[in-house]
């Protein structure tokens, strides 16, 4: 019997830096609203840096939730797939957690353990200064982040069950 590779949803960010806490916040929303199939792992990684690699290795799909640099208005949703993430020139940082995702993906490719698919669901931040709450622009984008995650899981045939009623949102840092 072959083992099914996991699908991982990874929230990345620093909850003490306003909008940079998007990833952990979105993970808490997902956990409160849905029960996930066994092969789907939902994890708040905080700011993993190069420790990202083990979470990417040998997976069917990795969905990363994070803030991303962009010229668009704060709160704009950006989706980057597979090669788009490593295609950026090295000096251009896509998130405040680099070195991190880009370098970790390159490491998994080198060791031939890279994820079959990866999707970065990012939101352009308004502020990454000190603070424990998301700005209104980024908080308003969270339902779109959740919808993008659900669309990917549905495409993969791993549909979570909606909690009725949802669990209480555990935002321990607010």
Stretches with model-predicted labels:
Residues 68-118:
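Helix-loop-strand module that forms the ligand-binding subsite of alpha/beta enzymes
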Residues 21, 25, 47, 72, ...:
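Conserved active-site and cofactor/substrate-binding residues in soluble primary-metabolism enzymes
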Residues 89, 101-174:
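Phosphate-binding/catalytic loops
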Residues 3-10, 15-87:
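Nucleotide and nucleotide-moiety/phosphate-recognizing core
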